[in-house]
C-alpha cells in the first residue's frame, strides 16, 4: 500500500518553515494520540502516519531525500519500517504547550483548499469586568488573505500555470517493477501550479502576516479558564480554504477585597472589640456598592455571614452566588493610660465573676487540664 505524502499528512505546504512543521505535528499528534483515542485502530494508524511524516520533515537530510525521491529516497538511507517506540517518550515535551483542536481541511496533491490555523489570545480581566461583562479591543498578529493577488500568489495581471509534469495533480507516479508509487511532483513541489511571477505583497504565498484589531464581547460571569471561540477569526485559509478560529482564554486578576470561589465571593471584614461584644450594624462592600450587615452581640472572630445573591451571576445559568463575609475582631492598639486602666478593670471584673465570659478560652483550658491529667495517670 502506497504511503501518503508527508506534507499532505501534516496538512502543510511544501515551503513550510520548521516552526510550521512542528506546529502542525503537535496539533495532529494531540488529536490522534492513543491516550485520547484508545481502542480506535483507524486513529492509531493516523497517529503513526503523523509521527513518521514529522520524523522525515524534521530531519534536514531525510527531508532533502524525500523532496527529491519520495519515500523511496528515505528508505534508501536505511530507515526501513516505521519505528513504533514508546509514545510517552516521543511526546513528553510536546503536550504541555498545545492549545486548540486538530487542523481541519484538505490534503492530497495539488492546490486543494486548506483551513487556516486556529489562534489563541490570553485576555486579562479585573474581577469587576469578569462579573459584569465587557467589550474589549484586542490586536492579534495573524495570516490574512492577500487582497493584491486575491490569494492566488501570482502577480496581479498574471496567473499561476498548471504544472506540465504532474498536470495539476501535485503528484507523479513512479514505477518499481510491478508496483506504482505516487510521490510529490519535483517540479511544482506538490502544489500542482507554478508561479513564475509571484505577488510582491505575499511573495507567492497568497497570504501575509498582519496585525488585526477586533472587538471581543465578554459575557458577564466568566472566570479564569473559560474560553470563547470566535469562528472564522483565525488565520486565513490557503487555496480558497476557510479561516481558522480564534480562542480567547480568560484570566481574572486577583482582587484587593474579594476572593472568588466559583459564583461565590469571600471577603474579610474587620470589626472592633466592642462591636463584636455588644453587637452592631456595619457596612460591608459588595460589587454593587455598600450594604448593611447586622452583627449580633457576642460574635466571635472568624464567624462567617452569608449575604444571599450578592455574589456572581453564573455565565451558564440565571443563578447568582452569595457573598461570604468573615468577621475579624481587631485587637485595639496604641492605647492611652486611661484605656489601659479601663481594660484592666474590665478583665478584673470578668475574672471575679462566676459567669463564663470566655467560652473558647475556658474550653481550651479544660482540655489542657484533661490532657495533663491523662499523662500523669
Curated annotation (Swiss-Prot):
Zn(2+) 2 binds at residues 163, 166, 185, 188. Binds 2 Zn(2+) ions per monomer. Its cofactor is Zn(2+). It comes from the Bacteria. The keyword Ubl conjugation does not apply. Keywords: Chaperone, Cytoplasm, DNA replication, Metal-binding, Repeat, Stress response, Zinc, Zinc-finger. PROSITE patterns: DNAJ_1, DNAJ_2, ZF_CR. Gene3D superfamilies: DnaJ domain, Heat shock protein DnaJ, cysteine-rich domain, Urease metallochaperone UreE, N-terminal domain. One of its GO terms (cellular component) is cytoplasm. Pfam families: DnaJ, DnaJ_C, DnaJ_CXXCXGXG. One of its GO terms (molecular function) is zinc ion binding. Disulfide bonds: none annotated. GO terms for biological process: chaperone cofactor-dependent protein refolding; DNA replication; protein refolding; response to heat. It is found in: Cytoplasm. Residues 5-70 form the J domain. A zinc finger (CR-type) spans 133-211. Homodimer. PANTHER family: CHAPERONE PROTEIN DNAJ, DNAJ HOMOLOG 1, MITOCHONDRIAL-RELATED. The J domain is necessary and sufficient to stimulate DnaK ATPase activity. Zinc center 1 plays an important role in the autonomous, DnaK-independent chaperone activity of DnaJ. Zinc center 2 is essential for interaction with DnaK and for DnaJ activity. Participates actively in the response to hyperosmotic and heat shock by preventing the aggregation of stress-denatured proteins and by disaggregating proteins, also in an autonomous, DnaK-independent fashion. Unfolded proteins bind initially to DnaJ; upon interaction with the DnaJ-bound protein, DnaK hydrolyzes its bound ATP, resulting in the formation of a stable complex. GrpE releases ADP from DnaK; ATP binding to DnaK triggers the release of the substrate protein, thus completing the reaction cycle. This is Chaperone protein DnaJ. It comes from Psychromonas ingrahamii (strain DSM 17664 / CCUG 51855 / 37).
